[in-house]
Amino acid sequence: MPSICPKSAMISLPTVLQSIFAFEVAPQIRNSSVRSLNRSSLRHRLRSTRTITTVSIDSIPVPSAQKPDDRVTSPSEPSLTADKSTASDTSSSNPASKATSADNSGSARRTKTNTKTSNEKQASDHENKKNIKKSAKETTASNAPKPPKEKEPWQIQKEALKRKFPTGWAPPKKLSPDAMEGIRHLHHIAPDQFTTPVLAEEFKVSPEAIRRILKSKWRPSGEELEERRKRWEKRHDRIWSHLSELGLRPKVPDYGSDADAVLYKRKSKGV
């Protein structure tokens, strides 16, 4: 009767299946679980690692001699590694975040300063433009021709007199009623001798005045002659008194005697 090996007696179908599962199927499960844990830790860090469920190796019945404790790490190790990586990332990101916040605050201050200076510059430019426009308006108003003022009635009359008498106003010499009667008398006696130019030269008046005196047919009545005589006497006294005050009183003119002297003198020359 053949002898039975004690080693072979220990081999059975369950043990063979367990050993095959431990060496072939279990490593694949462990590798796939590790990959999923690494991916989830990169995406969701700590939160995702808690939600992932993996198959525990301890639940698989593996012989004590063939249990690969040294080859594959436990599922808790990736979470610890992820915690360490997140802590290191947080610790490394803190100085960077502080530097970024400092840069942001500095840039904000510079932006505020630049905005303030730009606002002040715009205000000063606006003020300068207003001053330039104001000075330009004042210059234009000063250089613009002023509208003519409405003239007073006396100014209009003065200009009309200047146009009428460019060399100055010199009223014509007024002849007394006696002088006008003497002119008419001389022209009536000797019209060929006492022509209009001759009479104008003798009485120092214009030829037009002599012509109008000779042409006039109007004769005053007795009352009008008396009134005219009185008026001329008053005028004579007023003028001569004023001239005597100034010391400029000339000789008393006598138009009647002058007319008689001229008439009889020329008659005597003619005889």
UniProtKB/Swiss-Prot annotation:
This is Required for respiratory growth protein 9, mitochondrial. It is found in: Mitochondrion. Required for respiratory activity and maintenance and expression of the mitochondrial genome. It comes from Emericella nidulans (strain FGSC A4 / ATCC 38163 / CBS 112.46 / NRRL 194 / M139) (Aspergillus nidulans). The keyword Mitochondrion applies. The gene is rrg9. Signal peptide: none annotated. Pfam families: Neugrin. Residues 79-99 have a biased composition (Low complexity). PANTHER family: NEUGRIN. It comes from the Eukaryota. Coiled coil: none annotated.
